[in-house]
Amino acid sequence: MKKNTDSEMDQRLGYKFLVPDPKAGVFYRPLHFQYVSYSNFILHRLHEILTVKRPLLSFKNNTERIMIEISNVKVTPPDYSPIIASIKGKSYDALATFTVNIFKEVMTKEGISITKISSYEGKDSHLIKIPLLIGYGNKNPLDTAKYLVPNVIGGVFINKQSVEKVGINLVEKITTWPKFRVVKPNSFTFSFSSVSPPNVLPTRYRHYKISLDISQLEASNISSTKTFITVNIVLLSQYLSRVSLEFIRRSLSYDMPPEVVYLVNAIIDSAKRLTESITDFNIDTYINDLVEAEHIKQKSQLTINEFKYEMLHNFLPHMNYTPDQLKGFYMISLLRKFLYCIYHTSRYPDRDSMVCHRILTYGKYFETLAHDELENYIGNIRNDIMNNHKNRGTYAVNIHVLTTPGLNHAFSSLLSGKFKKSDGSYRTHPHYSWMQNISIPRSVGFYPDQVKISKMFSVRKYHPSQYLYFCSSDVPERGPQVGLVSQLSVLSSITNILTSEYLDLEKKICEYIRSYYKDDISYFETGFPITIENALVASLNPNMICDFVTDFRRRKRMGFFGNLEVGITLVRDHMNEIRINIGAGRLVRPFLVVDNGELMMDVCPELESRLDDMTFSDIQKEFPHVIEMVDIEQFTFSNVCESVQKFRMMSKDERKQYDLCDFPAEFRDGYVASSLVGINHNSGPRAILGCAQAKQAISCLSSDIRNKIDNGIHLMYPERPIVISKALETSKIAANCFGQHVTIALMSYKGINQEDGIIIKKQFIQRGGLDIVTAKKHQVEIPLENFNNKERDRSNAYSKLESNGLVRLNAFLESGDAMARNISSRTLEDDFARDNQISFDVSEKYTDMYKSRVERVQVELTDKVKVRVLTMKERRPILGDKFTTRTSQKGTVAYIADETELPYDENGITPDVIINSTSIFSRKTISMLIEVILTAAYSTKPYNNKGENRPVCFPSSNETSIDAYMQFAKQCYEYSNPKLSEEELSDKIFCEKILYDPETDKPYESKVFFGPIYYLRLRHLTQDKATVRCRGKKTKLIRQANEGRKRGGGIKFGEMERDCLIAHGAANTITEVLKDSEEDYQDVYICENCGDIAAQIKSINTCLRCSKLNLSPLLTKIDTTHVSKVFLTQMNARGVKVKLDFERRPPSFYKPLDKVDLKPSFLV
């Protein structure tokens, strides 16, 4: 549309990030972080977790130990491809095997003697089956030689029965910043977690809480359940750091507001009073006494010295190999944050802030489960050894315990939505469309219990920390997930790092920090603490912090540390800390670098000329200071300019205040929002609704839908959209299509297309317009004897079955047809019966409203016969089906009109779809009109000057004015037809045409907006929604219809449906629908004295309550539903008396007649 000028350099750089980067191993950018995460797990982390050598049991002062060693971990890929797995209905799993050795070590004078107890060399093909993540082009990390299918982006797991599963990324519960909480007025807590580094296995977790009550400052304690003593936080800091209380006072008071300094003095004075209250106070003796008291309280089997070492050595596991003095200074820095947060809570990251959280990707899920299940496996072996020693006196292990690691069940539960046993479930989805396949693996959500904690019934807002890193449009608009599940923006990704890379990076950073003068990094009293993954390593001179951070960022961008995704955050605002983050699970995205008030993109004149031939990794290598990868914590505490345009309008002094500059607005949207057009030109709610509808659009899948027995709806004749964004193109959503182009007219049509109603042309449907095919899986399990039984009486339900008892291929199934033979037989205990065998049909019937063709049948013979049938049905648009544009103009088919009924233009062209014109004004979707204008302009000039097809770029969010798009359309029409008059040119630009009435052949008085647009068909189909039926299955207890369409049932008729049918006649309709439809009803007798239901004894109805009191009951017959009788009977059985009372009226037959005066009127 416009030439690539210098002002668009930021947009071109952003596009470079989205496209594939083979030099960096990036072949599909949207899901690259998921592929890397899973690849790290299965190629590296799984070996680290399963390779174990540790003691199980120890005896005789640790001179005898039972050891376990797991080695020779091998992971083997499957022999077949993902498509073969789908066809066979198998899961696509890798096989992991290992060797377990259990032996006894005895320490003797000669040395250590080893006695073998048990050994198992795992070669079982079902030992550990790990679901394989299918990546771009059907690749997997174990076998990259599988044949490539370029349009298969993957990102899925194939579960059994060929169901492709994807899941969202959960936010970790553990926060990287302590959680501040106000317990009650003047009472506060500061909770934080400490997790051991990734190289320490098994992972150790500790959770601590610092409590502070203004009325009891002496009780300002730190505690941890069963893992640490409860001790005064100031005294613990003094004990660990070996400094005086005055040192701690100065450290806490430095650069603090007066109110915080006052509280610091009060806390230090309270600690002094505590020490003065103890005679001959000694800090070591004080801590030792607390440890001894805790040892007695816990009744620990360890000696006091072992107990103390275990408690203090494991204090703060994330600083496992750090001296106690640094641990003490770390506690002082935490206390400093705590005291500041009491007075300035709003300046501290709250618990919902993404600054505090890491994110679990696919690889991390499997890693966590593998770690937990391995500990359970080792625990089971230990318990089995102890039981055998106790019962038999021998150290032995049952082979069953060795061969059941338990990982298979955990991984299977993961794909069904169950992450951990204690954490509830998280969201997983079957893979249906391209949009879901990309959006769901990039969704980030909180744990289910975090949803409950976060006040799920209150309105949740878009958290400020999610700005730029999350899509502000693609969020749930209603329900408990509002604000709790978000979509990553197109530039955002999640970091991954190997354990070896982590250790090397940590070592390089520490060496860089220690390269500074020793005194400058030892300012522990008034300096800025430097932490690496929350582990304190130094304290920097306050006069050097700016130079340090600037130099660190420059070295990082130049590749000095070997990792471009390191995050360095300078926390000012009196909290005074430099935080360096290198771990996995951090949100990162690129930003344009501002250095000393200059946009580094502008000071590289060679960049523009070379940009077209470079990849993103090339830019990072050859122009390292132009772009920086920034994590969400660094972004939050940095000054970031909103756009390049605003930055260039500032003065030089204002520019120096900024550290980074953002890319254009289109890069802040997610991939679903990028499939929309011009959401910034519409009203706000249209973007949220548009994202929800785009994910419901029916697309064309690339996988083999005819052989794969799975549910799905697929577009038969998809078209690539003409108006697209760069993200839509690079993600291959555009190439794989999710709609068709149709010609629309914005006008009213005989009052039929009111509100959301649309008119659709009959001939358009007959030509395959927006035609779909529905693939549906039917599965039944039949006992083997029932399947082998022969039917005695010919049944119409078996008319589509072959002699083998299975439905025929290409048979058209109707409602009531059986898909496999299932005949139950029973023997009557009657000696006089000639044939005491009776049989009846119990087969599962086809229940859909529409006919379907049988495409494929699979049978598995075990103890039961498992039959799976795939049916296909072409489904053209019918009344009630839903459609939408990419601007959230959803419509429902109100009328299917013949071509002769529709208005036409001067060329005889009739619209495919007629949409109510008032919807544009009510919903304020101006970008829908722009899309029609741009699509029509493309049809005039579809090729550029080089003869190449060029789609029109209309990003979801953009700063381009509407006039620029109108100018583009004008140039297209002037190029193709330069002789147009001004009026004709204006009509073509704005897609205004004169239409003719089909009945009178006269033109309409006003022009009609008439042009092409990309139209989507939604998954909401009329025949799938039909749940009100007059016959079907019923429950055994209450004999009402089953609830749920999938179970062959219906819906219960409620008050809203009742209100809709009042016009039909309230009394008759309610009686028919609520009572007379098919629900069993019966006559019952009610006692008018006590209101009980009469009992029937020897065919005589009597009231038990009244008969015991020798009363003469009056029984009245009423007509009620069976479920009402069941309800009253069950309530009576639970001791609740429900009395049925009657309305008392005088009998109308015996009412006295009105007196009639028969006198002549003239005598009155």
Curated annotation (Swiss-Prot):
Domain of life: Viruses
GO BP annotations, alphabetical order: DNA-templated transcription
Principal location: virion
Alphabetical list of InterPro entries matching this protein: DNA-dir_RNA_pol_su2, DNA-dir_RNAP_su2_dom, DNA-dir_RNAP_su2_hyb_sf, RNA_pol_132_poxvirus, RNA_pol_bsu_CS, RNA_pol_Rpb2_3, RNA_pol_Rpb2_5, RNA_pol_Rpb2_7
EC numbers for this chain: 2.7.7.6
Subcellular location, record wording: Virion
Keywords: DNA-directed RNA polymerase, Metal-binding, Nucleotidyltransferase, Phosphoprotein, Transcription, Transferase, Virion
Membrane-crossing segments per the record: none
Pfam families, per the entry: RNA_pol_Rpb2_3, RNA_pol_Rpb2_5, RNA_pol_Rpb2_6, RNA_pol_Rpb2_7, rpo132
Keyword Phosphoprotein found: yes
Reactions mediated catalytically: RNA(n) + a ribonucleoside 5'-triphosphate = RNA(n+1) + diphosphate
GO molecular function, one term: DNA binding
GO CC aspect terms: DNA-directed RNA polymerase complex; virion component
Gene3D superfamilies (UniProt xref): 2.40.50.150, 3.90.1100.10, DNA-directed RNA polymerase, subunit 2, domain 6, RNA polymerase alpha subunit dimerisation domain
Summary of the function given for this chain in its UniProt record: Part of the DNA-dependent RNA polymerase which catalyzes the transcription of viral DNA into RNA using the four ribonucleoside triphosphates as substrates. Responsible for the transcription of early, intermediate and late genes. DNA-dependent RNA polymerase associates with the early transcription factor (ETF), itself composed of OPG118 and OPG133, thereby allowing the early genes transcription. Late transcription, and probably also intermediate transcription, require newly synthesized RNA polymerase.
Oligomer and partners: The DNA-dependent RNA polymerase used for intermediate and late genes expression consists of eight subunits 147 kDa, 133 kDa, 35 kDa, 30 kDa, 22 kDa, 19 kDa, 18 kDa and 7 kDa totalling more than 500 kDa in mass. The same holoenzyme, with the addition of the transcription-specificity factor RAP94, is used for early gene expression.
Family recorded in the similarity comment: Belongs to the RNA polymerase beta chain family.
Name of the molecule in the record: DNA-directed RNA polymerase
Species assigned in the record: Monkeypox virus
Lineage summary: Viruses, Varidnaviria, Bamfordvirae, Nucleocytoviricota, Pokkesviricetes
Protein's gene: OPG151
